[in-house]
Amino acid sequence: MRNVLIVMLGGFIGANLRYWLGEWMSSSSGFPTGTFVINAIGCFLLGWLLTYSEKNRLLSKEWSLLLGTGLIGSFTTFSTFSVETLLLIESAKYIVASLYVFGSIFLGIGLAYIGVRLALYCKKEEDIA
């Protein structure tokens, strides 16, 4: 039960961050900038956090649940991404929808990779020091 409460706390924080950042970044261009940027940031943070904390044994299981599953998990939003893509398609904005889908996938995977590599690099630097 404790772990559930920890995830809920992280989820509360992450969902609020997503809402306020999404509001701040809302755009009239038709491209869902807020969701795109939020998912990209989340991919990088989760890739970095999980790798860095595992390699350096920094986070307890509870902190990993709070930050990874709760905060970052609720901060990113695949369901919103999916609905926004469908709305773009229904509005016959096929090019924008395609850019959004492929951009989100490649940027997300790319930033997750950069986060993992950065965490591994930081670990090597600490081993040298």
Curated annotation (Swiss-Prot):
Keyword annotations from UniProtKB, A to Z: Cell membrane, Ion channel, Ion transport, Membrane, Metal-binding, Sodium, Transmembrane, Transmembrane helix, Transport
GO BP terms, alphabetized: cellular detoxification of fluoride
Activity regulation (record text): Na(+) is not transported, but it plays an essential structural role and its presence is essential for fluoride channel function.
TM stretches of this protein: 4-24, 30-50, 63-83, 95-115
Gene Ontology molecular function: fluoride channel activity; metal ion binding
Pfam family, one: CRCB
InterPro entries, per database record: FluC
Domain of life according to the entry: Bacteria
Binding-site list for Na(+): 73, 76
Subcellular location: Cell membrane
Catalytic activity: fluoride(in) = fluoride(out)
Annotated Gene Ontology cellular component terms: plasma membrane
Record family assignment: Belongs to the fluoride channel Fluc/FEX (TC 1.A.43) family.
Function: Fluoride-specific ion channel. Important for reducing fluoride concentration in the cell, thus reducing its toxicity.
NCBIfam families: crcB
This protein's name: Fluoride-specific ion channel FluC
